[in-house]
Amino acid sequence: MSTDKKFIYRRILLKISGEVLQGVNKFGIDINSLKRIAKEIEFIVKIGVQVGLVIGSGNLFRGAKLSKLGLNRVASDHIGILSTVINSLAMRDTINSISSIKTCLMSAIPLNGICEIYNYEKAMNLLSNHVVVIFSAGTGNPFFTTDSAACLRGIETESDIILKGTKVDGVYSKDPNKDSHAFLYRRLTYKDVLKKELKIMDLAAFTLARDYHMPIRVFNIHTPGSLYRIIMGDDEGTLITR
């Protein structure tokens, strides 16, 4: 990967879905997936990009799914919240083990001895000093997704864009696994997404991004070098703006 060009984003909020971490497994964490993503993060930090990180919990437990199985919704969401902490701990340890860049794991709920409580001023200071800040435990509240947490932290930390790393190449007109005529959108407006009822993220999260004019790019983080290319201005995945 060449560093001749200058990156176009000073600070990003990277949202990674939990499913990305499970690799080819049906459940849990795949160490090879962790290492590959950690290396991509390390590379962009070393060229000067500031990175905030939010990780989902779909590889472990989703609150909404657990509630459908009969658990209380609040308890289900608390299990999902704790699952994000597990994923975040794994990512922090992986980054620390393969690179020299610094990390800080913050939680929206108190978890003494495991990670520190989220603090806005400290997070801003750390990001400015090129420390990767991992925001875990979602918003700390039930009924809110990690997409909502990503939008919230992205707006709070004045990120230039939310980059949503998934297992697919971007936003499609329909599910490409079910419809051979589905096509990939390269650019969309917030209005387009709402009108077409495209499932980019939940409505609460998406509305928050729209109201604060926070651009979102959905891309396939499994594609080698995709994160770096986006940072350098390549039109990879799908960009959503006003």
Curated annotation (Swiss-Prot):
GO terms for molecular function: ATP binding; UMP kinase activity. ATP binds at K15, I16, S17, G18, G58, R62, T166, Y172, D175. It is found in: Cytoplasm. UMP binds at D77, T139, G140, N141, P142, F143, F144, T145, T146. InterPro entries: AceGlu_kinase-like_sf (IPR036393), Asp/Glu/Uridylate_kinase (IPR001048), Uridylate_kinase (IPR011817), Uridylate_kinase_bac (IPR015963). Pathway: Pyrimidine metabolism; CTP biosynthesis via de novo pathway; UDP from UMP (UMPK route): step 1/1. Its EC number is 2.7.4.22. Pfam families: AA_kinase. Inhibited by UTP. Signal peptide: none annotated. GO terms for biological process: 'de novo' CTP biosynthetic process; UDP biosynthetic process. Its main location: cytoplasm. One of its GO terms (cellular component) is cytosol. Keywords: ATP-binding, Cytoplasm, Kinase, Nucleotide-binding, Pyrimidine biosynthesis, Transferase. It catalyses: UMP + ATP = UDP + ADP. NCBIfam families: pyrH_bact. Homohexamer. This is Uridylate kinase.
